[in-house]
Amino acid sequence: MIEIKNLHKVFNKKLHVLNGIDYKIEDGEKVVIIGPSGSGKSTFLRCLNLLETPTDGQIFVDGVDITAKKTNIDKVRMGMGMVFQHFNLFPHFTVAKNIWFSPVHHKLMTKEEGKKEAMRLLERVGLADKADAYPSTLSGGQKQRIAIVRALAMKPKVMLLTNRPQPLTPKWSVRFLTL
């Protein structure tokens, strides 16, 4: 599904953060990138969905070079769910609206379909009772589950998380892998 060839990222022409990464990730494969703080893990993920422009190299998704100049970056990003260290839930939206807003806004589903999908996902992560709550009332683990299902609501081919699901209980960490 994803093939990375000779990926480099240099900041300010002198800080070489990514240095010739070659890697292939197959469909359904789960990959964890481990390293000390500042070692380029988040930069690597940001390059994969083109939030950072690689300095050199190529990234192929399903055989398509997404680093090519003609690439529709928005289309690439819609196929990759990304959950950041800070979950960035919309504070003025309910939990359910945080989930259904983007798929409806991008016309992937109707508002009615989006609301049904939000409830289905909330049920899968044990938070259906929080649908009408606001993010400020949630625990860290609950916020992370909402951020994950918000990304899943876009039906991405790939999920990228900049940090492991640490606020999740061991039970939810395992269940996350099957969502």
PLM features: residue spans?
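ABC family nucleotide-binding domain
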Residues: I2-E3, H8-L179
